[in-house]
Amino acid sequence: MTNQTVSPLFPHRHLLGIKGLSPLDILCLLDLADQEIAVSRQPEKKKSVLRGRTQINLFFEASTRTQSSFELAGKRLGADVMNMSVGNSSVKKGETLIDTAMTLNAMQPDILVIRHASAGAAALLAQKVGCSVVNAGDGAHEHPTQALLDALTIRRAKGQIENLIVAICGDVLHSRVARSNILLLNALGARVRVVAPSTLLPAGMADMSVEVFNSMEEGLKDADVVMMLRLQRERMAGSFVPSVREYFHFYGLDREKLKFAKPDALVMHPGPMNRGVEIASDVADGPQSVIQQQVEMGVAVRMAVMEALLDPRRNPGNGEPA
């Protein structure tokens, strides 16, 4: 990625995943997000680039930080933002995703942000509506804006991503965050490791250009970044780990395990955290943690994504789906 010129133009209509984005597309979004940070840090947190545009947030899975982040991002760009409460909607009365999509499409929104438990839901929605679609997480498939905000956090702390050793640890099997991060970090030249018990590793990891470890000591050795994943017990139908106590003993990030990584290694977590399950509180709140910075970068990245998709100066013709 060294010495390549990054275009300010983003040639896609949707953001459905990291897969389908080129390294230069990713850098375009990260560079724009760098600019958006200043907006969020000024007293008047507002710009009018999307004034008159309408954003609908359609969350079929519970979310606090992601939905709030998308809402703030849209409002700071000047868009009109509507949060659809699925719990009180026609979906609960038997309406299908397609029916809901067609109804919302008739209202002429400019962008739909969707989170859904089914992999491929965002892509299906994009085929049925006339506006841009952003995937805010679809099952265990992808979570592109999380990977982008993680990359932005790493780049701002370390100055680069290329050649860094990034260890992604924990429940990789059920994690859309892990999948999107692996795709993005590989695209930008990082050395990616996954660290997990064999029961929490998906099939086909060898095809994703990662090093696989079942030991935290081996997996964290000389790591520049340690990215912990939440143990997603709500997605587990069987017995994937013997007990929470045993899981933390072997795979929870505490001070002793963190010593295996480089002394200046970053500690990351996409949230929400299970303290005492995958990460100890003194590590989550410690000097190497950039978890709160990830939250701040989330708003900037989502601002960048929506501006890149909807601002005609950055997306003439609203491009092709990614």
Curated annotation (Swiss-Prot):
Pathway: Pyrimidine metabolism; UMP biosynthesis via de novo pathway; (S)-dihydroorotate from bicarbonate: step 2/3. Coiled coil: none annotated. GO terms for molecular function: amino acid binding; aspartate carbamoyltransferase activity. It catalyses: carbamoyl phosphate + L-aspartate = N-carbamoyl-L-aspartate + phosphate + H(+). InterPro entries: Asp/Orn_carbamoyltranf_P-bd, Asp/Orn_carbamoylTrfase, Asp/Orn_carbamoylTrfase_sf, Asp_carbamoyltransf, Asp_carbamoyltransf_Asp/Orn-bd. It holds the Pfam family OTCace. Catalyzes the condensation of carbamoyl phosphate and aspartate to form carbamoyl aspartate and inorganic phosphate, the committed step in the de novo pyrimidine nucleotide biosynthesis pathway. The gene is pyrB. One of its GO terms (biological process) is amino acid metabolic process. This is Aspartate carbamoyltransferase catalytic subunit. HAMAP family: Asp_carb_tr (MF_00001). The keyword Transmembrane helix does not apply. Its EC number is 2.1.3.2. One of its GO terms (cellular component) is cytosol. It comes from the Bacteria. Keywords: Pyrimidine biosynthesis, Transferase. Carbamoyl phosphate binds at residues 65-66, 115, 143, 146, 271-272. The keyword Signal does not apply. NCBIfam families: asp_carb_tr, PRK00856.1.
